[in-house]
Regions:
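Sec-exported extracytoplasmic/periplasmic mature domains
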Residues: 329-336, 369-370, 395
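Beta-sheet entry/capping signal
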Residues: 261, 298, 337-338, 374, ...
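Intrinsically disordered, low-complexity acidic regions
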Residues: 242-244, 279, 325, 343-347, ...
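N-terminal accessory beta-strand-rich subdomains and adjacent acidic, glycine-rich linkers
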Residues: 23-285
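Conserved, mostly hydrophobic/aromatic
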Residues: 128, 331, 405
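Aromatic- and carboxylate-enriched substrate-binding clefts and catalytic-loop regions
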Residues: 341-419
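An acidic-aromatic substrate-binding cleft motif
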Residues: 249, 253-330, 334
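Bacterial Sec-dependent N-terminal signal peptides
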Residues: 1-23
Length: 419
């Protein structure tokens, strides 16, 4: 009898031990945010703020051609660390310095992969890390959010993967978002109707497509990605038509970290503006020499259709030399170091080496130098792709920068073009 009791107690202890191993918690440095991770058929996680559960039963997986990472995960070990440091951006956008404090949990699994979680005082993030010797094909990624109740969603919904990211935002209850509705680009903003707002976004995107989100019709949000384009056809002066796609979303190095999926969790809208999560999660700068980078304000004629008006406009306004000298004078008067010349400075959009004679770019560069105002030129990405030596040529002319436009895609090929 004692033998059976002992075996029963041993079995109970074993079960409780397994459950304890399969439930893992990570707290933010201030203890306000908690990530609860469970390992079963998938990797699940909940997010709580001040004991209020804001995200529940979310799951994550990465499907490769040969295997699915995160499916029936087998934990081989875990490592924790805490970081408290100050980051100094080369080009400050919001702050001259950024406090970067977080607690990190690295979960190592069998089959050559890990999942890394970070908990900040204003949000959480996770990413996959793989350790394969050969290149891998990524078939898809499962980013799944199960909302505990009806939330208000703020979405930008394009017609498809080809988008200029200029659609107006929709503001809809999460239960009203149908699978047949348009998907959303990132970021999306989730209003819990209670204490918190959650900004969902990604960071450190490299050699991988952008993530889009859609509804499954059950108050859940899932991920969808553009596939790798294999063949292109002509589609005007600033675009290519995708004629053939692969059955995978990325073909990439097998030993790498994947993009961060992050949630900025705030109580007040103003803290969304102050959010620096994208910068804090970005890979370290790879440039050795950054002395040539000169950030500054720019005057851009596209906003007003290149047609200035007023008592001081004593010339025929338009895409011509007099109008752009007027813009240079305006910039010089108000201490703006750059003007941006949009479409029209070149004779055609496909020839970046022949300036529009009505504009006289070389005279404008000379005139701008007299006024301490430099010039940035607009170009379509397709023109840049076909004329990569133009950077050297325009630099020799005295042009200080290029605004590359109309990418309108975010598949792996185009993301690599960004880099």
């Amino acid at each position: 009898m004692k033998k059976y009791i002992f075996l029963l107690l041993f079995a109970c202890c074993l079960i409780f031990n397994i459950q304890a191993q399969n439930k893992i918690e990570l707290f933010s440095p201030n203890g306000e945010i908690k990530v609860s991770i469970r390992l079963s058929d998938k990797i699940y996680y909940d997010v709580s703020c001040s004991n209020e559960k804001v995200l529940e039963n979310n799951s994550l997986m990465l499907a490769l051609k040969e295997q699915v990472l995160g499916e029936h995960p087998k934990l081989s070990g875990q490592k924790r660390k805490s970081v408290k440091e100050t980051l100094t951006p080369i080009v400050p956008l919001k702050f001259a310095s950024i406090d970067n404090e977080y607690n990190q949990l690295l979960l190592n699994f069998r089959d050559n992969y890990s999942v890394e979680f970070r908990a900040f005082n204003d949000g959480i993030a996770y990413r996959f890390i793989t350790r394969f010797k050969k290149d891998i094909e990524v078939i898809g990624e499962d980013f799944s959010l199960q909302l505990p109740s009806e939330y208000l969603l703020h979405l930008q919904q394009p017609e498809g993967f080809k988008t200029g990211y200029e659609e107006f935002y929709s503001h809809i209850p999460s239960t009203s978002w149908k699978p047949s509705d348009r998907m959303s680009v990132l970021p999306i903003l989730i209003d819990t109707h209670k204490s918190y707002k959650i900004l969902v976004c990604e960071a450190d995107l490299s050699d991988y497509p952008c993530m889009f989100l859609k509804s499954d019709g059950n108050n859940n949000i899932t991920s969808v990605f553009p596939k790798v384009p294999l063949e292109f056809g002509d589609d005007g002066d600033r675009s290519l038509k995708i004629l053939k796609e692969a059955d995978y979303i990325a073909k990439t190095n097998g030993k790498r970290s994947f993009p961060w999926r992050y949630f900025s969790i705030v109580k007040e809208d103003k803290h969304l503006v102050e959010n620096t999560m994208t910068y804090k999660l970005a890979a370290p700068n790879q440039l050795q020499d950054v002395s040539w980078i000169k950030p500054g304000q720019v005057s851009w004629e596209w906003w007003n259709g290149a047609i200035p008006y007023g008592e001081d406009v004593t010339f025929k306004a338009g895409c011509n030399l007099a109008t752009y000298k007027y813009y240079i004078d305006f910039a010089a008067k108000y201490g703006i170091p750059y003007i941006l010349m949009d479409e029209g400075w070149a004779k055609t959009t496909q020839d970046p080496y022949t300036p529009n004679p009505d504009v006289d770019l070389h005279e404008l560069i000379r005139y701008g130098k007299e006024k301490n105002v430099d010039i940035i030129l607009w170009l379509s990405w397709l023109t840049v792709e076909k004329n990569f030596d133009l950077f050297k040529v325009l630099g020799e002319w005295g042009v200080k920068g290029i605004k590359i436009d109309f990418m309108d895609r975010s598949d792996q090929w185009m993301v690599n073009f960004y880099e």
